[in-house]
């Protein structure tokens, strides 16, 4: 019983990590953020909305 629970927990953690990695797409260059908003800029791997 305990072993089954441990395996299930490990699989759930693995699935959560994989889903998180798919959702977080790091930008590498300035133009990677143009699809979401014209005023977005790539800063430290994330698309950040810039004022103006």
Curated annotation (Swiss-Prot):
Localization terms from the record: Secreted
Disulfide bonds: 27-42, 33-47
Signal peptide: 1-21
This protein's UniProt keywords: Amidation, Disulfide bond, Secreted, Signal
Modified residues (Proline amide): 51
GO CC annotations, alphabetized: extracellular region
Positions of the pro-segment in this chain: 22-25
Tissue distribution: Expressed in salivary glands. Highly expressed in the head, body and tail with a 2-3-fold higher expression in the head.
Major localisation: secreted
Secreted among keywords: yes
Function of the molecule: Leech salivary gland peptide with unknown function.
Family: Belongs to the annelide toxin family.
Extra facts: Does not show effect on voltage-gated calcium channels, potassium channels, and tetrodotoxin-sensitive sodium channels. Does not show activity on Nav1.7/SCN9A, and shows very weak activity on cation channel TRPA1.
Protein name: Peptide HSTX-X
Originating species: Haemadipsa sylvestris
């Amino acid at each position: 019983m305990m072993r089954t629970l441990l395996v299930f927990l490990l699989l759930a953690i693995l699935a959560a990590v994989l889903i998180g990695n798919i959702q977080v797409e790091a930008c590498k260059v300035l133009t990677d953020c143009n699809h979401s908003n014209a005023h977005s800029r790539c800063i430290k791997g994330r698309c950040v909305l810039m004022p103006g």
